[in-house]
């Protein structure tokens, strides 16, 4: 399927985890050649069903491209194919044009104004949409993969103890359980009924933990690999991944937090880093562990 889509649409490849000027230049070249470009402004799909921040660079690109900007929002996609999940679910997906902005209008706007307009046009809250217009989304084993989004148990505060199996979510540490319904909600004893609210709660709770002296995220069985220009990887280190406010390290390899420029997640749970020299790394894990908690911690440090 991937090869078919590439051959049909000839997409512009974008490197995750940092700014990719080659992708920007490729977009500008195609626009100036009269081609249309579909750009997903967030740069990734979300884990919680809420449109994330729009990078300021996207606004800069829109203003300098000299092309008409059409904003289009897609609804239902989060429940049809949640980023954290496996497979597709049958349900309603819809789209709507929100705005059309000619080049002259964009030239008269600042980057901040364009970014704000993009945020307004593209904002969607999947859980809120379900409350207004409930739609069932049915599929096989719909709770599988929830641990990619949910890394902290609200009952026992254990990290990486949650597991989604079939249509159920449970904590391997305290035994708490819930059922994931066709409407994308949780019914059970966790005290959280919406993935959106759980994701926000765990990030806020992580921020409180980070205020404690000596707090660090740790995971054993991690392999650090450097990603080459040809996308091949070279193993750099293996051991326990450790991230605190000052460093991220594994084995004999360490990177000061000031030199960490970007943290991203590839697909569902592959952690990607970009340093100040533009070097890119990824982490492979020999067990279930969350990449999102490291991304959250990095963003909280940089706030």
What positions do the PLM features span?
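ATP/pyrophosphate-binding catalytic subdomain of soluble kinases
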Residues: 119-122, 126-142, 146-151
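Soluble catalytic domains of membrane acyltransferases
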Residues: 1-116, 132-133, 140, 155-156, ...
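Acidic, Ser/Thr- and proline-rich intrinsically disordered linker/docking segments
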Residues: 259-303
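Phosphoinositide-dependent membrane-docking surfaces
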Residues: 14, 241-270
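Long, charge-rich boundary regions
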Residues: 177-255
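Short amphipathic C-terminal alpha-helix that caps PH/PH-like domains
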Residues: 5, 110-126, 289-303
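Cys/His-rich short segments
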Residues: 138-191
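General beta-strand recognition
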Residues: 94, 170, 249, 270-272
